[in-house]
Amino acid sequence: MFDIKKELQKVPHKPGVYIMHDKNDEIIYVGKAIDLRRRVGQYFDSSKKLAKVAAMVSHVEYFEYIIVNNECEALVLESNLIKKNSPKYNIVLRDDKQYPYIKITNEKFPRVLKTRRVLKDKAKYFGPFPNAYAVNDIIDLIHETYKIRTCNLNFDKGQKLKRPCLNYYINRCDGMCVYDVNEEDYNKELLEVENFLNGREDELTKKLTDKMMAASKNLNFELAAKLRDSITNIQVILEKQNITNTKGLDLDMISMAREAETVCVQVFFMRNGKIIERQHFIIDNKYEESNEHIVGEFFKQFYIDLTYVPKQILTDIEIEDRDLIEEMLTEKKGSKVEIKIPKRGNKTDLLEMVRVNAKEGLDKYISRHLKRERNRENAILDLQDITGVKPIDRIECYDISNTSGVDSVGSMIVFKNGAKSSKDYRKFKIKTVEGADDYASHREVLTRRFRRLLDSDKKDNSFDEMPSIILMDGGKGQVNIAKEVLNEFNLDIPILGLVKDDKHRTRGIIYENEEIRLKVNTPLYRLLFAIQEETHRFAINYHRKLHEKNFKKSELDNIALIGEKRKKALMKHFKTLDRIKKASVEELCEVDGMNEKAAENIVNYFKQ
């Protein structure tokens, strides 16, 4: 048992990060402190607690802490832990869209790629870009202008080819896959690409202009026209605007808008005095944090993974931990970074433009959010009318997945108030059923689920909530199995079956032995379709992982002459390893690809 008062006495007076857990071992809050004992102790001092702090502390089952050298290290660690765990009571940065980046890989003869994931792999990332099509255009333009390779060869390991690919013959690559290419010359071209991606397009424009003039001189007017269009389109591709800063500065501009429990933080990126892109983030603010706290938390999480930090960041809000954040960013950049709050002049006008865009982004998000909420409410109301259950807070849906009866698994997915609740999803490895028996597998899954619900001695609390209704991915057979299981536990929960048409699309629901057809594009149809697809996806993913794991780790791997192909054929034919063990030489020889010697090896191996 974790005694909070006793554990507080063990916390050192040192800088670090503290982590609060609830009874389900979920991380619900992460914070930093110059003095861990004093800061953590404040949470449990009843005389000094605010209402929102009291709400969080009431759910704390235990805490842990990590000691670091200084407050700056604590800030970085806190930001990383918040980003990784998304604790319930922290301000969590959530991008309204997952924008793409352009990546220059960290390898011999680096490549230029499009990606949506920023990894800590020492590569260089540029973006994010609001327009995914623009990213494709930018990469195409780079490959048309510079001889940057597109192949996946690993030159660090010395991979080579006998003949170069098509790009070599159309003069888009120097063929380092076959010939010796000067790395220094290659990297010079790559540096021009980096400058272009940082908003300094002069070198690229000059290179294209020179090519255009040469093409025109050689009477190749078609190529010259194409190059002219590329020059014209550079501004459009990078989504540049006519707003400029005469000093040609690199800076970011950050503002926000808030309404009720929702906040939109807007960032504009200025490079070489020109605004090249923007990005906005939606933040849930159900605990009514101050603007200073929200934007301070935004700074910590937003800049922790960015590869490029400008010398200057403008904002119109006085942020928490400003000096500490400046110190963190300065250390990250390797040179001085300033966070400024301008009071007059051109920069205040620019920030006002950012604020207006934040308000616009917030209004659009709320409009979309309200529409989704209305659709969910209407779908739930329709379900209530069909089942007579009010309210419908929790929907559970079940599905079974296997490959020819091998590695059968069950899935339980949960929707709360019409929205998926992935933390409540559960996976079941089928233990008592051999082969592809959908009914028996469903019976096992449902029995295990509701036995845990009613088990008074259970250690696992994850099955404590009772569903309002149950959905079965199937027809009357699956529904009847579910009814039998619930009757065994004396439970009365409405059960609906989700039936599909010949094209495997949701057709309707089975309720009280009758099929109710659904009209496509109604809120109820969209909700049930989403639930059915999510259940199937979750089951399939778990089955594949389990199947791959079991396939890779098999006793058959220890037998001579049994490789991957034969192992796969044996499992497909016999379904289980136990059946293979019991098979005779003659039965084993019936399998595709097997011969007598390989069959004898299997029989002799399992006789040992």
Swiss-Prot record:
- On whether DNA repair is a keyword of this UniProt record, the answer is yes
Coarsely, its chief localization is cytoplasm
Q: Name one GO molecular function term.
A: excinuclease ABC activity
Which intervals hold domain GIY-YIG?
Answer: 13-91
Q: Which SMART domains match?
A: GIYc, HhH1
| UniProt entry tagged with the keyword DNA repair | yes
The UniProt family comment states:
Belongs to the UvrC family.
The record's section on HAMAP family has:
UvrC (MF_00203)
What is this protein called in UniProt? UvrABC system protein C
Recorded source organism is: Finegoldia magna (strain ATCC 29328 / DSM 20472 / WAL 2508)
